Design a protein with these regions (language model features):
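Acidic, Ser/Thr-rich peripheral helices and adjacent loops at domain boundaries
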Residues: 175-183, 187, 244-249
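Glycine/aspartate-rich loop-and-adjacent alpha/beta segment that forms the canonical ThDP
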Residues: 47, 217-249
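Conserved internal helical-beta-strand scaffold that buttresses enzyme catalytic cores
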Residues: 1-141, 145-159, 164-174, 178, ...
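Hydrophobic/aromatic ligand-binding patch that stacks against planar heteroaromatic rings
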Residues: 150, 185, 214
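Functional cores that coordinate and move charged inorganic groups
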Residues: 194, 202, 208-212, 216-217, ...
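Short, ordered loop/turn segments at secondary-structure junctions
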Residues: 163-166, 198-199, 227-229
Length: 249
């Protein structure tokens, strides 16, 4: 669940609404499991009926095609902004391998920019949502960050949002990284990193607007570190009081 980091939703909403005013036509989003269903419902407009049907399992027209868990499935929709502008938003499918969706998002974004928008990097905006443990622990994040300014791979800057709940499954953050901040990987390219209290929704929206302005003006990556908490366990089967008894007291 997203409880403890719910401000991700107004952050995404603010980015999409304001980016549409700046001429962005498409958004490509990559994220893992945390908050995915919430995002699908509240940002992408996926019908609740569709989401709940995936909890009990459903048949597909293609008999040779097997389903996937609800936290892996992608979605594409057309969204009308508050200003009346139609934009297309795509949530890339992802596996259980955290952060591996990052380069996929970059590839989809670059392909759309090249094929449909005459290489105009301002028309397609990539947004990657990370977990604090994964962004610090998965080497693919560094690889993607290093692609930021390479001629063959650049997409005009990515907005990285970290849902920082200060715990990775059962690992305390002090046992999961050597750096001070989980977003320190962004310092490799001198990317601006905004640390914001996830409980302060207005501050989160302000940081999101700043990040968008920076990306659109300088065509560079920017990071937002939403410092919050995880109200419940890692998933439906995890009881966090066993492994973090003091934190969940």
């Amino acid at each position: 669940s997203l409880e403890g980091g719910e401000s991700l939703i107004p952050a995404l909403d603010s980015i999409f609404e304001n980016a549409a005013l700046k001429g962005v036509k498409e958004f490509v989003v990559g994220m893992a499991h945390r908050g995915r269903l919430n995002t699908l419902s509240n940002i992408f407009g996926k019908p609740a009926k569709e989401i709940f049907s995936e909890f009990v399992g459903k048949d597909y027209e293609e008999q040779i095609f097997d389903g996937d868990v609800k936290y892996h499935l992608g979605w594409t929709s057309k969204r009308k902004s508050d200003s009346g502008i139609n934009v297309y938003i795509n949530l890339a499918p992802n596996p259980s391998h955290l952060e591996s969706v990052g380069p996929v998002v970059q590839g989809i974004t670059r392909a759309k920019q090249d094929k449909y928008h005459k290489q105009n990097i301002e028309k397609v905006l990539p947004v990657i949502i990370h977990g604090d443990a994964a962004i610090a622990g998965q080497g693919v994040v560094y690889e993607v960050v290093q692609m930021e300014r390479l001629k063959g791979f650049k997409t005009g800057g990515t907005i990285h949002i970290v849902v920082n709940n200060q715990v990775g499954f059962t690992t305390n953050y002090i046992d999961g990284r050597s750096s001070t901040y989980c977003t320190d990987v962004g310092k490799a390219n001198l990317c601006p990193i905004l640390h914001v209290n996830a409980d302060d929704a207005e501050a989160v929206v302000h940081a999101s607007n700043f990040a968008l302005e920076y990306r659109m003006r300088y065509k560079r990556d920017v990071f937002i570190d939403l410092l919050g908490y995880r109200k419940y366990g890692h998933n439906e089967g995890d009881e966090p009081r066993f492994t973090q008894p003091k934190l969940y007291k």
